[in-house]
Regions:
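Extended interaction-bearing regions that mediate binding to partners or small molecules
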Residues: 345-346
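C-terminal motif of bacterial Sec signal peptides marking the signal peptidase cleavage site
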Residues: 15-17
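Extracytoplasmic redox metalloprotein regions
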Residues: 75, 79-84, 88-329, 334-341, ...
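Long, low-complexity intrinsically disordered regions enriched in Ser/Thr, Asp/Glu, Pro/Gly
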Residues: 7-8, 19-22
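Sequence context surrounding c-type heme c attachment/ligation sites in exported
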Residues: 21-158, 163-165, 174, 349-591
Length: 591
């Protein structure tokens, strides 16, 4: 069977609104594409959902994800372990180190009942009622830009609706979407006037499991460093300075050398290649030693590595910080989660329509000791009060705090497909993964997974800038030498946490449940064989998620599925063994 290719629409199509050549369907069921209206019409005509309430209707433990309730043991004794991707031995300064959670359902009296009831809803009839033509028209509709090219949310938030205004002061105090998804040849986003927005796209290995397109969504991620890191020492925007600072941050996050375009270190006054002299270099060398600390002035000095431009001065002044495994303060990430599009050839790719627009910002710097103390305090609190839930501060307008220096905020589709702010309870869904597991690097998943110097544009590009998508991208290899996706298949014996992806099972496993060697060998050279769905599966998952959107029941789960999930507990006794023997790994840097 020929495996489906993965394509990504050109930017002009991605953001041009609904396609005019949608194939005809065989029934009359339709979803109307989002009207192409200007922002003022959207503001006056749209019924704005009230999302300001802090009341939690379903679960204060919504930071415990649906995947955590998966059944790991089958009646025949077979054991499945998708848990190790998130709950794993961590690297300092992530002190969570929670590989032991693979081995038991370490819930509390407040979380042992699965609150994600949407998993058990049968949507067979609702999905069957939707034609392919209808869902394609819907996912090709643009719910980010209006017909004039303005960012709809940006226009609305200039005069924030009272239904979205948490403190009812008439001002939006949170993130205002400002990315135009108009990327130059180096992945930098430009606004309509040609100016840099600061956002830069990068390509990466999708995180195992849920975030593979075969399980329902495509996505992209962009990074933006604070303004001081985009400026030269005169305080003027300088793209070359910004590129170097991004490379330095990448080296610190990956703890490895990073290839760059040849530069003259004398221009920047920083020994990037750490050879003791200012000369020409084609790499940022990662070599770290803890800086000195003056207890009298309470300042760090004598760093082993330095930023360039104005950021170097800020670092020396201790207004900007640096450490391995940590981003500088005010680093931002933008993450869109999208539907799957299918072209006339059956190739599956990124749809224009966004399911979610997710935003994260590092609001405060925490030292290694502070992060360690926070982790230890969490452990002590859990031991002393096992049934006490975490207290997550924040609100839907300004975002929710992780407690580790990050703020997360999101926008999600309303019933008609427009993007709206997530409520407090809907945003709780994001917090557990970004602050309570061993897999993250300074609260993030993807930047450590960015493609390296051997990739196109050294990994600095948006998916829409690649004609081949995931085809012929080699499987990531862990720092310990094991193939990462193969390890997932070996440990989980499935292609997703719920073991509902029949396509992956049929392709990679034989009748006895053993991996097929020839398929694994092919996977090593082409990850699209695993992570890209067929046209039929893509359409099915699009329809299933659209039904959830119409219901607006995100607080009960947003996992796209048709039949009720069979391999998930509705409740499980506290500390029940999973039957798993914990998997540990040395994950980064990926090879």
């Amino acid at each position: 069977m020929k495996h489906p290719s993965y394509y990504l629409l050109a930017t002009v199509l991605l953001f041009a609104g609904c396609s005019s050549d949608t194939p005809a369907g065989d029934d009359n069921t339709t979803f109307s594409p989002l009207p192409e209206a200007n922002a003022s019409l959207y503001e006056t005509d749209q019924v704005f959902t009230d999302v300001t309430a802090m009341t939690v209707k379903n679960s204060y433990g919504a930071y415990v994800t649906s995947q955590c309730y998966t059944k790991t043991e089958e009646s025949d004794g077979n054991v499945h372990n998708p848990c190790f991707t998130c709950h794993v031995n961590s690297v300092e300064p992530n002190y969570i180190d929670d590989a032991a959670l693979q081995e038991s359902y370490a819930f509390s009296e407040a979380t042992y009942k699965n609150p994600w009831s949407n998993l058990f809803v049968d949507r067979t009839d609702a999905v069957a009622a939707v034609s392919d033509a209808a869902i394609l028209a819907y996912v090709r509709g643009d719910n980010y830009f209006d017909a004039n090219g303005s960012i709809m949310l940006g226009e609305i938030l200039k005069h924030v609706p009272d239904a979205w205004d948490y403190n009812h002061d008439g001002q939006w105090g949170g993130f205002v979407p400002d990315c135009y998804f108009a990327f130059d040849g180096e992945g930098f986003d430009r606004d309509p006037g040609g100016d840099y927005t600061g956002w830069r796209a990068f390509a990466y290995y999708p995180f195992p499991g849920t975030f593979w397109p075969t399980n329902g969504s495509t996505d992209d991620v962009l990074i933006r460093l604070p303004e001081v890191m985009r400026q030269n020492k005169e305080g003027v925007f300088d793209k070359e300075v910004y590129k170097l600072n991004l490379a330095i941050v990448e080296a610190l996050i990956k703890r490895s050398d990073i290839a760059i375009e040849p530069v003259d270190e004398k221009v920047y006054g920083v020994d990037l290649n750490q050879n003791g002299t200012l000369d020409n270099t084609s790499k940022v060398v990662y070599r770290w030693a803890a800086p000195s600390y003056d207890f009298e002035t309470k300042r760090f000095y004598n760093y082993a590595m330095y930023y360039v431009g104005r950021a170097q001065n800020a670092q020396i002044d201790n207004a900007l910080h640096m450490a391995p495994g940590l981003y500088p303060e005010q680093t931002e990430f933008l993450h869109t989660v999208r539907y799957l599009d299918v072209d006339a050839n059956g190739s599956v790719g990124m749809a224009p329509r966004m399911k979610e627009l997710r935003y994260g910002r590092k609001s405060a710097w925490n030292t290694y000791p502070q992060l360690s103390n926070a982790a230890q305090a969490e452990i002590k609190d859990k031991d002393a009060f096992p049934n006490r839930l975490r207290t997550i501060t924040g609100n839907e307008e300004t975002g929710l705090n992780t407690g580790l220096g990050w703020v997360y905020q999101g926008f999600i589709e309303d019933k008609e497909g427009y993007l709206r702010p997530q409520s407090y309870e809907e945003t709780l869904f994001c917090i557990g993964c970004h602050s309570g597991i061993g897999a993250v690097v300074d609260s993030t998943f993807v930047f450590p997974r960015k493609f390296d110097g051997g990739a196109k544009q050294r990994g600095w590009y948006h998916w829409t800038q690649s004609d081949s998508g995931f085809q012929e991208i080699k499987e990531p290899v862990l720092a310990d030498g094991r193939y990462e996706y193969t390890l997932y298949l070996e440990a989980n014996h499935a292609g997703d946490e719920f073991r509902g992806n029949d396509e992956v099972t049929a392709r990679f496993f034989d009748g006895n449940g053993s991996l097929i060697p020839s398929e694994i060998e092919a996977l090593h050279s082409d990850i699209s064989r695993l992570i890209v769905p067929s046209k039929a599966r893509a359409m099915m998952l699009n329809k299933a998620y659209r039904v959830i959107v119409e219901e607006q029941g995100y607080i009960y789960g947003r996992d796209a599925h048709v039949a009720p999930a069979a391999n998930v507990h509705q409740q499980v006794a506290v500390d029940t063994p999973t039957g798993i023997k914990a998997v540990t790994m040395e994950r980064y840097p990926l090879q």
